[in-house]
């Protein structure tokens, strides 16, 4: 099972809509500052496709990739409301392959932190730049080492009418890895609650490490 497979059906309900809207608007402002006009966009680690769909609705032609089949199922259902839906592709980031170059690439909501091995993030960067047009932009965010360290031995909860999610987080200074232990409870149609468990791992990449890997 890939990360977020069990969580996929409840993921959007646990995220505030405003986060996506603000992120899409911010990305569009950055696109306007690009050295080349941005019409085609790669969304790397797209999750349930909310950002990809918002950009599609703003007129961009979007190719969106993710490793979770369940996340992409949610994304495809969401994209049915788009006039020009994104193209969703089941791919891992280090094995990225596109049929043609794009004007811009994005990776949001700490997707790159899930690459815990140096060779994987280095290969991901190499492939992103391989499929970027000359002058194209690569825009991404990460959870910082400071944030992930602060999450050590913490407990977080998210709740909707039909789901309850508990996150327990632990940080290993030696490995620079933050482990998320996720218990998800979903209300079934018969009134019983169903429990799923997932474990996620994020690597704390420093600015210096990312700069070196990008060079």
Give residue spans per PLM region:
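A short His-aromatic
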Residues: 113-115
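Class I SAM-dependent methyltransferase SAM/SAH-binding core
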Residues: 42, 50-95
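SAM-dependent methyltransferase
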Residues: 139-213
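A short acidic, Gly/Pro-enriched loop at the edge of an enzyme's catalytic core
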Residues: 97-104
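A short glycine-rich, Lys/Arg-flanked "PGG" loop and its adjoining helix->strand segment in the class I
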Residues: 122-134
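Conserved class I S-adenosyl-L-methionine
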Residues: 1-45
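Residues lining the SAM
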Residues: 108-110
């Amino acid at each position: 099972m890939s990360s977020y497979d069990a969580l996929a059906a409840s993921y959007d309900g646990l995220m505030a809509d405003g986060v996506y809207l603000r992120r899409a608007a911010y990305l569009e402002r950055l696109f306007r500052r690009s050295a080349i006009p941005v019409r085609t966009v790669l969304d790397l680690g797209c999750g349930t496709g909310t950002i990809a769909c918002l950009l599609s609705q703003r007129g961009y032609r979007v190719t969106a990739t993710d490793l979770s089949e369940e996340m992409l199922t949610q994304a495809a259902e969401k994209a049915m409301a788009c006039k020009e839906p994104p193209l969703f592709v089941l791919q891992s980031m280090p094995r990225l392959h596109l049929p043609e170059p794009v004007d811009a690439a994005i990776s949001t909501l700490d997707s790159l932190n899930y690459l815990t091995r140096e060779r994987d993030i280095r290969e991901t960067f190499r492939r992103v730049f391989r499929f970027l047009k000359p002058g194209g932009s690569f825009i991404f965010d990460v959870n910082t080492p400071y944030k992930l360290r602060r999450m050590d031995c913490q407990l977080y909860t998210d709740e909707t009418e039909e789901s309850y999610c508990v996150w327990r987080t632990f940080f290993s200074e030696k490995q620079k890895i933050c482990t998320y232990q996720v218990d998800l409870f979903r209300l079934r149609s018969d009134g019983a609650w169903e429990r799923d468990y997932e474990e996620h791992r994020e690597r704390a990449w420093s600015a210096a490490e990312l700069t070196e890997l990008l060079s």
